Design a protein with these regions (language model features):
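Residues forming the flavin
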Residues: 1-257
Length: 257
């Protein structure tokens, strides 16, 4: 028996770095507040074109990480150590994508789209993390030097143009999102904000189908969590796991309390 699958919407983008002191000043009202850790943030925007732009996996006092797992693919993520003591804050700033962006609508269309972005990103940086300042990204220009602050990364970097990795509508959405976030957090859209490409694995690009009882077409198989396409992070995966566990109990141990 086959498990039916379908392509699903997800989101892709880049890691954006800012000075942690700038984020602290916006969130706390001061660059440093005794007793408070490096400040986090969460920003979202719903654009008129229907796309969403939002922060994902924000890392206060953190590092941009080369998290590539496949040959000739480059992918970034973010991390913070327990004490959150790096000089920069970083977060993925991602744009929603749907099957209409994939160029096909079969179950693996999103996977192929994801792989296409990762391999092109690899070429841009020749295996290193490609970086571009936001101002240069807006002007379609190669970055030649950092601005008032430098990058905090786990992995080697190189200046390269990130323009054209996303399609024109997505690029414009990203720029509009950054500008909007600049109204929420002063300096968020500063010209020397550092962009690292690309963040492509925010959630699964496909979904294993299940019915209203959370069960697939195969009895006893319950697609669940992030890999099955029903979550986009630790918390949402945990919640989906609880729902599936409750469904299993209801079916096999209805008398359980």
């Amino acid at each position: 028996k086959n498990l039916p699958m379908q392509a699903k919407s997800f989101a892709v983008g880049v890691r954006a770095e800012h000075p942690q002191k700038m984020i602290n000043a916006s969130q706390y009202g001061a660059e440093s507040v005794p007793g408070l850790p490096a400040a986090p943030y969460k920003v979202t925007a719903k654009l008129e074109n229907g796309r969403g732009v939002y922060s994902f996996c924000m890392c206060p006092g953190g590092y941009v990480v080369n998290s590539s797992s496949t040959e000739n693919h480059t992918v970034v993520n973010g991390m913070s150590y327990h004490d959150r003591n790096s000089k920069n804050a970083n977060s993925a700033i991602i744009v929603s994508v749907s099957p209409k962006d994939f160029g096909a609508d079969d179950a693996l269309a999103g996977v192929r789209y994801q792989e296409k972005l990762e391999t092109e990103n690899y070429k841009r940086g020749n295996g290193l993390i490609p970086q571009q300042l936001f101002g240069d990204f807006c002007d379609d220009r190669l970055t030649t030097a950092y601005g008032d602050f430098s990058s905090c990364t786990k992995g080697n970097t190189v200046f390269a143009k990130l323009n054209g990795l996303m399609n024109a509508d997505m690029e414009q959405s990203f720029k509009l999102g950054m500008e909007h976030f600049g109204h929420l957090i002063h300096g968020f859209d500063r010209k020397d904000a550092i962009l690292s490409g690309m963040e492509t694995r925010t959630s699964s690009p496909l979904r294993i189908k299940r019915d209203e009882s959370f069960e697939s077409n195969i009895s006893g198989v319950y697609p669940c969590g992030e890999g099955a396409g029903y979550a986009g992070g630790i918390t949402s995966a945990a919640i989906d796991g609880i729902k599936v566990a409750e469904a299993i109990i209801k079916k096999y141990r209805p008398d359980f309390k």
